[in-house]
Every structure is written in structure tokens, then in C-alpha cells.
Amino acid sequence: MRVMRSLRGNSGAGLISRPARLSSLRSVFTGCRAVMLPRFGGPEVFELRENVPVPNLNPNEVLVRAKAVSVNPLDCRIRAGYGRSVFQPHLPIIVGRDVSGEVAAIGTSVKSLKVGQEVFGALHPTALRGTYTDYGILSEDELTEKPSSISHVEASAIPFAALTAWRALKSNARITEGQRLLVFGGGGAVGFSAIQLAVASGCHVTASCVGQTKDRILAAGAEQAVDYTTEDIELAVKGKFDAVLDTIGGPETERIGINFLRKGGNYMTLQGEAASLTDKYGFVVGLPLATSLLMKKKIQYQYSHGIDYWWTYMRADPEGLAEIQRLVGAGKLKIPVEKTFSITDVVAAHEAKEKKQIPGKVVLEF
């Protein structure tokens, strides 16, 4: 990583310290540190820069002084070139989606948050100015108050993954009390969030996982956890399900998941092909091709199995974020953090994730 006068221990440099309500035309904040992505590649392409401009806030936006941000798989994929059709024209960009911190300033129309309040939240997957920076900018509906019962490190690990799971379960499948949910990849952040959200909704949950996460999944309320490295899930699991969330997204898990659904059920995969096809063929060809592929699968599975098929992506959802906050505050939703790094060690953090040295959640601290 190229470091341009790192400001570790002086994250306020280049800033006037007075927090304020900001109009969309001016800002009392001039610049801050940020981890910039000037080109796609391995972890070494990151540059830690100082005095990166802080844009003026729009009326509905909030300036958040970051205390912790998590490293999501999407961050690593974007760094390596995923979504280049969206991001390449805007390089250098700031990656990162999750953040937990303190409100430093608010736009003129923001009503639910105030300066000095501790908050956490997540940006949309295609946001160009991410959260790997001292001062992140999110819209009001992308943030909520951080429960006092958890730390910024713990909070930063939650929102993007939990909102992705929320969209799958509540917007796509619309799960209700008493229904059965099967999760492929229950040990990952999205899968583990889905288990906890479904249990809180009164659902019966079964999950596939690797052995070291089995106890944690059962402790979270799942009724069955199947170690796919040693067990055959098609033999170990009995009965039909109302919904399947596939966080793995391979041909085999899709086949198995579809066959486990009862008629009227919902199959949701995180591995939709809109971005990859657009990257390969461009917007003009790739986006219609992706839409056509999705519709083909929807029609195919509706005809052959009587189920609905979805590509699931995270979206801002104030109602979902409010419920996530409530469950977090009640101790019913958490994502374990395996290791923390300083923001100045972002290259090491990404290298560890890329080499699969740290299977669990990684957080960057400021």
C-alpha cells in the first residue's frame, strides 16, 4: 500500500472541529484520511491518503466520524475488479460499506439524528464514496442509533450483512412465524444474520456450515446444523422448506435448494449475475442479458417446481434497520468479530481475507 503521510492518531487533521448542521452548499470539513482504490488489483493497490476532500452534504445526508468499519467480501471483490462497469469510470474510489461511529454533521432536512449521536449503518453496494475513511457520508435512512450495549467494533460488523439477509427473508420470501428456512452457508455473516432474523420471527431454521461454526449456529436458535464437509445434506435433512437462502450460490447448492422447497416456496441466492454480465459485456448488452437470464430462471423454476427464484442484493431499508437495531440491543442479533486491524493496516487485513487466513469477520479500527 502506498501511504501518503499517514495520519494515525490525528484523524481530525485537515478538519475544523466544530460539528454543525450543514447546508448542501457548504461544509466546515475540508479533508480527511481515506483508503483510496486508484486501480483494480490485489490488496497492495490501496493507498492511504490524507486531505481527501469531504463533499458537501445533501439535505438528507449525515457525516459520520468513523470509529470502525468492517471488511465485507464485497469490498474484496470490488478491489479486485468486480463491478468495474460501475466503478472504473470513477476511479479512484473509496471502498467499504459498513460503518459505526459518531454523527459529526447533518444535512438540513435530517430529523432523526443529531450531532454527537453514536450510529451505525451501511451504504448501498454501488456507492462510490465508501466507508474506509475518517468521515463517511450516508443518507439518513442508511443509519440508526447504535445500541449502547455493543461496541463500535461489534456494531460495524452487522448492518450490511443483516440488511442483505433482511431483504432476502422479508422482501423476497416474506417469511412468517412457523415457516421453515434452509440456509446454505450459515456460518458466514449473511447466513448467520438470516438464522437470527428468522428465529426472531418464529421460524424453524436448518443450516449448512463447516464444523467449527456448528455450535454457534445451534446456539443462535437453529434446529439443525449440517456440516457439509462430513455430512450429506440431502440425507441429513428431512422435509420441505418454505424458503431457501443460498449464500454459496453454486450449481450444486442451487439444485439441492430448489428440490428442498415446497410449492409456493422461495429460493434466494446472493450470487446474482447482473454485475458480472455487465462487467463482461457492458451496460448496453450485459444488463438486458442479466435480466433475460433472471426471467428465464424464474419462469423455469415456476413451471418445473412451482417456486419463486430471486437474486438478492442489499438495499437501504429503514424498517429493516430499525428491527435490526432492536434485535441487536436485545442481544438477539450479533456477528462475531474474529480479528481487528488498524485502518493503516488495511492491506494486511485484505491479504488475510484473500488468503483465507481469517475465516470470520474482520474489522478496521480508527
Spans of model-derived segments:
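N-terminal mitochondrial targeting presequence
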Residues: 1-32
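Terminal helix/beta-alpha structural elements that buttress the NAD(P)+-binding lobe
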Residues: 2, 25-58, 65-106, 111-366
